[in-house]
Amino acid sequence: MNPEATELLLAGAQELGLDVAPVLDQFAALLVLLQEGNARFNLTALKTERDIVLKHFVDSLTCLGGGHLDGNHQVVDLGTGAGFPTLPLALMRAELQFTPVDSTRKKVEFVRATAEALGLQNVRPVAGRAETLTRQPEHRDRYDRVVVRAVAALPILAELALPFLRPGGLLVAQKGPISPEELRAGQRAAGELGGRVTEVEAFTLPVLGDARTLVVVEKLRDTPDRYPRREGVPNQQPLFWSAK
C-alpha cells in the first residue's frame, strides 16, 4: 500500500471513530490480494489504491457506526462480491462470525482464499442465491445481522435479507441516497416481511464526501413462508415498488 493510500485509510477510519493501525498490515495485504485477484477474475471495477481504500475499505467500515454490529453476532453479508464489507469488518471485529454470500462461485472462492491468506478464522463464505439459501433450515431464521452494500431498492433488500434473520435481528443496509418513495415502499415491504424500518441515517463518505444512507430494519417476527419468492422475482417485481 503506497503512503498516500495508507494515510487515506488511517484518516478515513479515524473520521469514523475507528483505529485501523493494529491491522494496517492486513489491510495492505488485502489490497495486494484484491489487485492480484482482479487481474485474474475481474472482481471489481475499482483499480487504483486510492479508490480501493476509500470506496471498498473505508466505505465497508461505515456500517460499524451506531453500534449495530457490536457483540458476538452471526452475520450474513448478502451479495459480498469481492468480499465487501465482510473482509474489512472481519479484520476489525474478530468477535463477529461472517457468512458472505454470493451467487458467483469465483467470487466466493476468492473470498475464501483471501480470508485464509489473511488468517481470518471468522469468515465462512457460501455460494448461492438468497431465494434458495433461505429455504434451507441451516440459513433461514439463523442469523443476528445481515449487512449489504447495494444499489438495489429497499423492498428488494428486505425480501432477500429478512428471511435470514431470527426475530430481533437487524438488516444493516449501506445505500446511496434514498428517495421518499423508495423509503415508503421499503417500510411497507418490511412490515409485510415481519420487520420494520428503525433507522435511516444520511451521511457522507469520509474524505470523498459521497452521499450515503444507512438503513436499519429490525425483524420483529417470523417472515411468512411464502417469502422470499422464487429466484429472480424479488428483483423483477419488488414488493410495493415500481421504479419510475
From Swiss-Prot:
The gene is rsmG. Belongs to the methyltransferase superfamily. RNA methyltransferase RsmG family. It comes from the Bacteria. Residues 225-244 are annotated as: Disordered. Coiled coil: none annotated. Residues 234-244 have a biased composition (Polar residues). Its EC number is 2.1.1.-. It comes from Deinococcus deserti (strain DSM 17065 / CIP 109153 / LMG 22923 / VCD115). GO terms for cellular component: cytosol. This is Ribosomal RNA small subunit methyltransferase G. It is found in: Cytoplasm.
